[in-house]
């Protein structure tokens, strides 16, 4: 869908035209009051559930072991298929679920690989630097164009959870509930550092060409692959890696004394993830999304440094789900949000699930999240 009006951005620029790629699941009620917006993480897209009409060459299902754990990834199964559908956490027998590709994306929504109307060429580094708030304003404009004024809920994990929180702050009168999973009120310095390493890996690849690699026949695949390796390590926990790979060798019964080949299973896994990712994701989009993650800070943006003040206007019921082994977005961040909301007398429910997979738990622990979300959406939470 092409938005009818320009999108105003935090950097001071206006972006137009803006196209938003989206998918929907379920049936919109006559009163248009059963809409749930689901928001994807850094490398996701609008295809959240079901089988893609045109299966992608590579799976878009992120998550440790999630890429083909049910044998359907090659068919293009949506990244949150286990959570969206009849009888699932986001029950399409009750709700009309909408999923969009984020502003700045590379899966159909306007981003750095889109044509700049001023030149007819891809924006590249001339695309404006965006924030999570810009993504949410774009979603709001998109829903306006669909004729949807109010949301029953906004839900997402990781960056998607940040968007849910941003919705509650920016549009307090337009969303009834939020479900923020494996998220945080602000990325902590360690997470910022890992993001910086990933971005540097891309920008130091000579094939990046200052971000103007489109149409040149070259792309920063080496740097992008390195960024993906870094990302995957941050998504996992040490016990999960040890359980899956231990120190098993990949191709031999003994070491080969080579510098260039992946001799251990864990090395081969990371190389495979890198190779798959560069086939389906744009390096500039990765840079823009990573920067938006780093900027996100509710207390700084809306509370003068106080999270409590930033959340003072929130009216949505809030469900927070965190995971014990998630060191990238640790449970303490969700606990801080819950504490601030409760101090303000606002309804907030938090669950910390004991699970070993690290940040990827939000994609892997669907069965344990489902009853929590169903109760929250069905019975008003706590």
What role is predicted for each listed range?
Residues 335-382:
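Catalytic active-site module of serine/aspartate enzymes centered on a nucleophile-bearing elbow/loop
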Residues 174, 180-276:
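Alpha/beta-hydrolase-fold enzymes
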């Amino acid at each position: 869908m092409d938005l009818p009006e320009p999108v105003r951005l935090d950097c001071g620029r206006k972006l137009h035209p803006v196209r938003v790629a989206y998918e929907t699941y379920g049936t919109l009620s006559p009163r248009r009051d059963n809409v749930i917006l689901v928001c994807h993480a850094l490398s996701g897209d609008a295809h959240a559930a079901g089988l893609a009409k045109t299966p992608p060459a590579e799976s878009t299902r992120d998550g440790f072991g999630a890429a083909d754990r049910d044998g359907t990834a090659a068919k293009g199964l949506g990244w949150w298929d286990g959570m969206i559908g009849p009888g699932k956490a986001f029950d399409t027998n009750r709700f009309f679920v909408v999923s969009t590709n984020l502003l700045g994306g590379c899966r159909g929504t306007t981003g750095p690989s889109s044509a700049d109307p001023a030149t007819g060429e891809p924006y590249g580094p001339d695309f404006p630097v965006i924030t999570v708030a810009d993504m949410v304003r774009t979603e709001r404009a998109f829903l306006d164009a669909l004729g949807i004024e109010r949301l029953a809920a906004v839900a997402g994990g990781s960056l998607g959870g940040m968007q849910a929180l941003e919705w509650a702050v920016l549009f307090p009168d337009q969303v009834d509930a939020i479900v923020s999973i494996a998220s945080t009120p602000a990325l902590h310095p360690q997470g910022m550092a890992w993001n910086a390493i990933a971005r540097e890996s891309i920008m130091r690849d000579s094939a990046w060409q200052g971000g103007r690699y489109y149409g040149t026949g070259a792309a920063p695949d080496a740097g992008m692959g390195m960024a993906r390796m870094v990302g995957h390590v941050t998504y996992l926990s040490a016990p999960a890696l040890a359980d899956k790979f231990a120190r098993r060798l990949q191709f031999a019964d003994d070491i080969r004394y080579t510098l260039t080949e992946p001799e251990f299973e864990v090395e081969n896994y990371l190389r495979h993830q890198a190779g798959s990712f560069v086939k389906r994701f744009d390096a500039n989009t990765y840079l823009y999304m990573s920067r938006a993650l780093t900027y996100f800070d509710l207390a700084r943006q809306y509370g003068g440094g106080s999270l409590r003040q930033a959340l003072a206007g929130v009216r949505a019921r809030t469900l927070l789900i965190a995971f014990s082994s998630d060191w990238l977005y640790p449970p303490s961040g969700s606990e801080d949000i819950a504490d601030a909301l409760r101090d303000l007398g606002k309804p907030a429910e938090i669950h910390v699930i004991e699970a070993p997979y690290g940040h990827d738990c939000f994609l892997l622990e669907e069965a344990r999240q489902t009853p929590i979300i169903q109760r929250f959406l069905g019975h008003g939470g706590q």
